[in-house]
From Swiss-Prot:
InterPro entries: Cell_div_SepF, Cell_div_SepF/SepF-rel, SepF-like_sf
Assembly notes: Homodimer. Interacts with FtsZ.
Keywords (A to Z) from UniProt: Cell cycle, Cell division, Cytoplasm, Septation
Gene3D superfamilies per record: SepF-like protein (3.30.110.150)
Compartments it resides in: Cytoplasm
Polar residues composition-biased segments: 153-178
Any single GO CC term annotated in Swiss-Prot or TrEMBL for this entry: cytoplasm
HAMAP family given in the database record: SepF
Transmembrane segments: none
Name of the protein in question: Cell division protein SepF
Family: Belongs to the SepF family.
């Protein structure tokens, strides 16, 4: 077909000269009626379009709710751990995530590793808005946010420990400024 005849057909509105329509295959009505899957899909799509769109959204929202571990049961658990190495610290973090209180007795660890362990578990406790307390020498309490930690020291408040006469065990001389670590100071006001 020449360019001029094609332009005439387009301007005249003659759609029969377009060859693309001849290649389309149409499904016969018998094939469409025989396919049950298409009917079921059509019924489902109509049911969704006729339903309330807000009701459909509310059904999806309830499926996104995730329960917190440890909330369903009303009993509390306390884990007492005596780790020997830093490798056991993720167990303490996992217990805190499960909303369990953890008491760490770090007397069996090297002091440097114990400091590292306390920093690690304290960071995990802070991340879950928990609480931490030092209970004793190398013994620490870490609790999740659902546990209230209060501290009171009855041995300091008891009258048997309070002495009536306050005496100082330190004796001060007239010059109370300490010597600087780098040697004599010429700028001292007490010289």
């Amino acid at each position: 077909m020449s360019l001029i005849s094609r332009l005439k057909a387009v301007v005249a509105g003659d759609d029969f000269l377009d060859d693309d329509f001849d290649e389309l295959d149409y499904a016969s009505e018998d094939e469409f009626n025989g396919n049950d899957d298409l009917k079921q899909n059509y019924k489902k799509s109509n049911a969704l379009s006729n339903s309330n769109p807000f009701e459909f959204m509310n059904n999806n929202r309830t499926s996104n709710v995730v329960g917190m571990p440890g909330i369903a049961n009303s009993s509390s658990e306390v884990n007492l751990m005596e780790p020997r190495s830093f490798d056991e610290m993720p167990q303490a973090i996992q217990a805190l995530r499960e909303r369990k209180t953890v008491i760490l007795n770090l007397t069996m660890m090297d002091p440097d590793q114990a400091q590292r362990a306390v920093d690690f578990v304290a960071g995990g406790t802070y991340a879950i808005d928990g609480h931490q307390e030092r209970v004793g020498e190398s013994i620490f309490l870490f609790a999740p946010s659902c546990v209230n930690v209060t501290s009171s020291f009855p041995e300091e408040a008891s009258p048997s420990n309070v002495s009536s006469k306050k005496t100082s065990q330190y004796k001060f001389e007239t010059n109370t400024t300490p010597e600087p670590a780098w040697g004599e100071s010429k700028l001292s006001a007490y010289n």
